[in-house]
Regions:
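Short Pro-Gly-centered flexible turn/kink motifs
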Residues: 29, 161-166
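Surface-exposed, gly/pro-biased binding rims or lids
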Residues: 5, 63-71, 75-78, 143-161
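Glycine-rich active-site loops that engage anionic ligands at enzyme catalytic sites
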Residues: 113-149
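Active-site/ligand-binding surface loops and adjacent short beta/alpha elements
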Residues: 38-40, 48-123
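Acidic, contiguous internal or C-terminal segments within carbohydrate-active enzymes
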Residues: 2-40, 45-47
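A short, structured loop/turn motif at beta-sheet edges
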Residues: 18-24, 51-56, 133-137
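Beta-strand-rich interaction surfaces with strong enrichment in secreted/lumenal proteins
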Residues: 14-16, 100, 156-161
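Beta-strand secondary-structure signal
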Residues: 14-16, 26-30, 59-61, 108-110, ...
Length: 166
């Protein structure tokens, strides 16, 4: 429906969660609308993961060498910062994150500890990786996003869905 003042566009969304062999979870989002004009949209997930034990015992690696610069309110400024810390496996001991990174095409993220490994493999429609370590240090948020935070205002990665397209 289009009666939400924060997002006044009607649309239909469907989510398909598919568990495949070898513990592979595939999540597919499909959005469609019948408005006469294109509508803005962005998609992303905000899952928290734990591998058991504190985050300080985890390692993180992902295919990104660029971080989006944030202002004091954690809104992207449009500037980019070189950040190659996670191109190789990096311990998360005493590392606190609340950052957005630009993933390389076909990039992935690997979270591991001495017992488990989690691979997050977003497709090309999710070029932003948001990583957050809460103060309690018992989990980590690894979010694949179609655009940067606040993209309805800053336009970074904002997508436009054409009428009757998916």
């Amino acid at each position: 429906q289009s009666n939400d003042p924060g997002y006044p566009f009607g649309y239909t969304i469907s989510l398909c969660w598919e568990l495949r062999p070898n513990n592979y979870l595939s999540i597919t989002t499909s959005i469609m609308h019948s408005n006469s004009n294109p509508i803005p949209y962005a998609d992303g997930w905000h899952p928290y993961f734990t591998l058991g034990g504190p985050v300080d015992q985890y390692q993180l690696q992902f295919d990104a060498d660029t971080q989006l610069e944030f202002d004091a309110d954690l809104i992207p400024t449009g500037n980019k910062i070189k950040d190659e810390r996670f191109l190789q496996k990096q311990s998360l001991e005493n590392i606190f994150l609340d950052n957005s990174f630009e993933l390389a095409p076909n990039g992935k993220c690997v979270l591991s500890n001495q017992h488990l490994q989690l691979d997050v493999v977003p497709d090309e429609h999710y070029p932003i990786l948001q990583v957050y370590t809460p103060e309690h240090r018992k989990s980590i948020a690894i979010e694949n996003l179609s655009g940067a935070p606040d993209n309805f205002n800053n336009g970074i990665g904002l997508l436009m869905l054409l009428p009757n397209k998916q």
